[in-house]
């Protein structure tokens, strides 16, 4: 049985957000770095640092929280893994789903790399739907 690194980073970020942790440490791979770059560019993550520990690289993410009048912090990050090792989900460029009418994003793995649904629609390419973020 293989290791699902995408599900691991989604779970780590979701758990840290629910527990109001400011920082998350995830293992650095090419896929995780691509996904984290998208999260940083879309504004879901404030800052990213690369950390080396015993010949292993880790990414340290600083999560963005929004203030609420009733609570000190309100969680806002919802992530859902779609395609998984046991059930791959693919979509062409016309059938890429829109999350909350375009407010959320879909992260796809395409032949031209990992990108958001907007980029894939502009380039008119489809791919494997990795996760939804809203």
From Swiss-Prot:
GO biological process entries: translation
Top-level taxon of origin: Eukaryota
Stored InterPro entries: Ribosomal_uS8, Ribosomal_uS8_CS, Ribosomal_uS8_sf
Name of a matching Pfam family: Ribosomal_S8
Keyword rRNA-binding annotated: yes
Keywords: Chloroplast, Plastid, Ribonucleoprotein, Ribosomal protein, RNA-binding, rRNA-binding
Quaternary structure, from the entry: Part of the 30S ribosomal subunit.
Protein name per its UniProtKB record: Small ribosomal subunit protein uS8c
């Amino acid at each position: 049985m293989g290791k699902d690194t995408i599900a691991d980073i989604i779970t780590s970020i979701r758990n840290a957000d629910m527990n109001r942790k400011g920082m998350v440490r995830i293992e650095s791979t090419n896929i995780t770095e691509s996904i984290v770059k998208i999260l940083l560019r879309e504004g879901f993550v404030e800052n990213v640092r690369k950390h080396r520990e015993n010949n292993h690289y880790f990414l340290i993410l600083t999560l963005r929280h929004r203030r609420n009048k009733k609570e000190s912090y309100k969680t806002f990050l919802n992530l859902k893994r779609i395609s998984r090792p046991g059930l791959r989900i693919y979509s062409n460029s016309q059938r890429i789903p829109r999350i909350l009418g375009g407010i959320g994003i879909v992260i796809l793995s395409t032949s031209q790399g990992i990108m958001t649904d907007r980029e894939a629609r502009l380039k008119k390419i489809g791919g494997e739907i990795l996760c939804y973020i809203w």
